């Protein structure tokens, strides 16, 4: 059976949800892509405020409980040329490190991101005989990344499998222009799902 590794760029997925106006269920994402074979591991990358607030801690705990390996990096405040301050953290290096250091443990890498910075790492994976699937939305996926992948999945096409039902983004966020590495707040209530699952056991 084909071994699957899942790598989720949390900021990019958050930005996609803002653009689409509906939210992703992280447990369903895990189940959907694990169904492609035998899941080796699922990595989730997200920036966090320092110190973390309770909501963010619950979100991280819920992801861990679901089976994700969560990588975090503290947000830093940066000032741009216009004098505006942004909170920012980039986890590209962490994702690429896991992607390449675990290469012998999977056959297919599934990347939930549209970031063109991953074009070269994907080329390296394919040169090693690995299959790479990229999943995102077209309007947020670089041409280079989409072109180099073995397969591209439009998240809108699998909405029924990965959406969190009954949850909609606030109207002011729907279709909002996004800056992927400036946003970190979780959109779902996965921590509530984890609590409910514990109670059922």
Spans of model-derived segments:
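Terminal and domain-boundary accessory regions
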Residues: 1-201
């Amino acid at each position: 059976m084909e071994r699957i590794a899942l790598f989720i760029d949390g900021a990019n997925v958050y930005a996609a949800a803002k653009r689409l106006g509906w939210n992703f269920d992280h447990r369903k994402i895990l189940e959907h892509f694990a169904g492609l074979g035998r899941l080796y591991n699922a990595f989730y990358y997200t920036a966090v405020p320092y110190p973390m607030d309770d909501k963010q801690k619950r979100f991280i705990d819920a992801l861990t409980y679901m089976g994700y390996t969560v990588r975090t990096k503290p947000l830093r405040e940066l000032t741009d040329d216009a004098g505006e301050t942004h909170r920012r953290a980039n986890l590209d290096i962490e994702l690429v490190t896991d992607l390449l250091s675990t290469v012998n443990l999977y056959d297919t890498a599934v990347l939930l991101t549209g970031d063109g910075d991953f074009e070269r790492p994907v080329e390296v994976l394919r040169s090693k005989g690995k299959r790479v699937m990229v999943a995102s939305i077209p309007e947020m996926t670089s041409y280079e990344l989409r072109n180099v992948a073995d397969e591209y999945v439009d998240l809108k096409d699998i909405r029924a499998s990965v959406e969190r039902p009954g949850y909609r983004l606030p109207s002011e966020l729907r279709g909002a222009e996004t800056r992927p590495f400036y946003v970190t707040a979780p959109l779902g209530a996965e921590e509530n799902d984890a609590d409910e699952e514990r109670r059922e056991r």
